[in-house]
């Protein structure tokens, strides 16, 4: 399939969910995923989180005991500000209550520890793996294979239900590129990459609090390499993003649609900073100077 969104759409099509199923999502859930749930006739319901936006095992336990939804959908890493959810600790809680857990690892694969224990995951080749666009991934835990609503196909006799989830027309070059990206990660060592990216995130967050006119979003939240900053002096984030790009500093403009459950619709936006393992001090200096220069 061509993306994590396409993978999620496939899961929604084949998973044994009741009509109008209630899907528990944290407020930081990726906005397009929530939109997709609604388009499929499902009912996204907000899950409780702590002050940092974290869905803790204790909060999930209380919610599932008192008012369990039919499904949980959690982003391993929130795309708009890098919040890392403790999905590996959430999985046994969900399983104890018989509620399936899906995890979107699009921003987590090749970035943080992506071992989730989930019943299903969706991901993409690009982003932190630095693989090609146009390749998505879906994984389903073995106990669910025979419960998927996947009819047999004469064209593929003997193929299992998960194999039948694949697109008929494959982006073969993209899949090869994904293989190369995965091989590079394994050669380097996933643990070493995760540790370095955590260090990168700390370096960025340590460098930015003193930049006038900007503040770090959720500085106390668990995070990897992603940091988000928002203006405190009335700057236009879209204009700043463009100005920074002109100086060779790449940031991502994050508008409320990325996490409408957490970010008010009238919020002017924030800038996401997502450096990789090759970050050097000069990059941080350029970022800090560029942000400081935009202050009114």
Region locations from a protein language model:
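Hydrophobic beta-strand scaffold residues
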Residues: 44, 101-102, 216, 251
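PLP-dependent enzyme catalytic core of the Aspartate aminotransferase-like
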Residues: 246-247, 257-296
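Structural signature of PLP-dependent enzymes
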Residues: 162-206
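Conserved beta-loop-alpha segment that forms the PLP phosphate-binding cup at the N-terminus of a helix
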Residues: 1-23, 30-34
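Active-site phosphate-binding strand-loop segment of PLP-dependent enzymes
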Residues: 52-105, 110
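Conserved PLP-binding catalytic core of the aspartate aminotransferase-like
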Residues: 198-202, 211-257
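PLP-dependent aminotransferase-class I/II
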Residues: 25-71, 241
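Active-site PLP attachment segment
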Residues: 117-157
